[in-house]
């Protein structure tokens, strides 16, 4: 769901929108083609290796070291194409959607490399360089931000292109979208410890994760409101435009998920919610409600 569906959606939508917002063709089309085939190979190898039991056992980072290296190569190629296209743009301004795509590309690269530092013992087995509470902290720094940047920042870049396009209205507040970007980039990276409440992780780190999660509610809802209010003067289109309905519904799920996340990060709430189906429902609201509804709407748009 995350890397096959979500990954392909992000490659496609970022390559599509960056050309139109920069008024230029893709930089290095052959490298872009390599990104496509390389990512399909990653998905194929994952589909083969995981059922056979070849796994690092890390959530969201289960793939073994040879596939990790392939992901790194493909991701560097992705960055070259995307940022190369921005460098050759015909417009002076870099559209806010491209800021979100760019932030997602850079941050996911850092997360992937740091969390997957491993000592290979064979072609199909490796051991993490981290251990104990440190390993848990690095893993959930990665795990939380894989969701935060892969499924949030990247798809917000998608939202900031397709919602105004489908509504035929400018972004409600461009200034708010810039504040949204920098606040999200600054705060999201610190919230990972809320996955490790009541564990061996130092209490100060757990509390820091909780506080950052609560602060994160403001930029998250700022972005959701900005997307919704972009329909100002175009609400009547919801009667006849099914694509716009799905886009609005995806924003509603984004708002709901980003309210649940900070609430569940509160230690007293987490004591009740952890290890329950509420956590699973929270993740599914984001992945199936926000991500799937947004991208299927975008695909239908084109």
Sequence positions of predicted segments:
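Short aromatic-rich membrane-water interface segments that cap or initiate transmembrane helices
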Residues: 1, 61-69, 133-148, 207-213, ...
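Hydrophobic cores of alpha-helical transmembrane segments in multi-pass inner/ER membrane proteins
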Residues: 2-12, 70-83, 146-160, 214-226, ...
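Membrane-interface helix-loop-helix modules in multi-pass inner-membrane proteins
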Residues: 2-92, 120-126, 191-212
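Cytoplasmic membrane-interface regions of multi-pass membrane proteins
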Residues: 17-24, 83-92, 159-169, 226-236
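Membrane-interfacial loop-to-transmembrane alpha-helix junctions, especially the N-terminal start
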Residues: 24-39, 95-101, 170-183, 239-248
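C-terminal ends of transmembrane alpha-helices
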Residues: 43-58, 81, 106-135, 158-163, ...
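Short helix-boundary/re-entrant hairpin motifs in multi-pass inner-membrane proteins
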Residues: 139-192
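Conserved small/polar residues in nucleotide/adenosyl-binding loops
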Residues: 295-302
């Amino acid at each position: 769901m995350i890397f096959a569906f979500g990954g392909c959606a992000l490659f496609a939508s970022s390559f599509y929108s960056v050309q139109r917002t920069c008024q230029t063709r893709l930089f290095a089309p052959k490298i872009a083609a390599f990104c496509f085939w390389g990512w399909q190979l990653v998905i194929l190898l994952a589909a083969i290796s995981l059922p056979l039991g070849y796994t690092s056992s890390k959530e969201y980072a289960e793939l073994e070291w040879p596939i990790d290296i392939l992901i790194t190569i493909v991701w560097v190629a992705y960055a070259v194409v995307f940022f190369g296209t921005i460098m050759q743009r015909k417009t002076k301004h870099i559209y806010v959607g491209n800021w979100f795509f760019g932030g997602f590309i850079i941050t996911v690269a850092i997360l992937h490399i740091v969390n997957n530092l491993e000592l290979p013992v064979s072609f199909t087995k490796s051991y993490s360089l981290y251990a104990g509470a440190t390993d848990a902290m690095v893993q959930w720094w990665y795990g939380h931000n894989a969701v935060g940047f892969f499924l949030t920042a990247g798809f917000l870049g998608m939202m900031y292109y397709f919602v105004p396009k489908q509504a035929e209205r400018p972004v409600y507040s461009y200034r708010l979208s810039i504040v949204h970007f920098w606040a999200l980039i600054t705060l999201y990276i610190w919230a990972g410890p809320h996955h490790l409440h009541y564990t061996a992780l130092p209490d100060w780190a757990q509390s820091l994760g909780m506080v950052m999660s609560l602060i994160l509610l403001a930029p998250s809802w700022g972005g959701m409101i900005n997307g919704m209010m972009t329909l100002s003067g175009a609400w009547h289109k919801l009667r006849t435009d099914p694509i716009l309905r799905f886009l609005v519904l995806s924003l509603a799920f984004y708002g709901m998920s980003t309210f649940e996340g900070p609430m569940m990060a509160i230690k007293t709430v987490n004591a009740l919610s952890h290890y329950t189906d509420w956590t699973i429902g929270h993740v599914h609201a984001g992945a199936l409600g926000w991500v799937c509804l947004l991208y299927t709407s975008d695909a239908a748009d084109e």
